[in-house]
Amino acid sequence: RSQWTIGRKDGFSSLDLGELESECRISFDVVFKEESKNFYVFLNSDKDNENAYYIGIDLVMKRMTFDRWPRKRNDYPFMLELERYIEVLPNVKYHLDIIRDNSVLEVYFDNKYAMSARMNDFKEGTFGFAETFGEAVIESLEYMALER
């Protein structure tokens, strides 16, 4: 499938795309609609999205974040050291590249911003997209297992 639209104006919407391999690359384009507030890529999620890592694109605060749920300490909306300010606007196509090498995660937003993180606790699960109080269109999704 070449395009997915996810979102709800009144809450949370998600799309699970299947098992995430321990060494892989996820590449896609995304357009955030005018009312979009938060877009997420979830990684190593359980079937209910109750335990997962999240790459977040916050259109209100203009930042890319990395988080896990449930959180270990404090109740910050993301891991404080894993926040990158980004230029992001609605109705513009952006490209994301996500590379996973076991516990190492590299995220590239629109070939301008990068973020590195570790995923030490949740070793396996699914991946997909989520949107809150808005709508996003995902296009040109490529998923590749990486071989050594």
Segment roles from a protein language model:
Residues 1-148:
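Extracellular glycan-recognition regions
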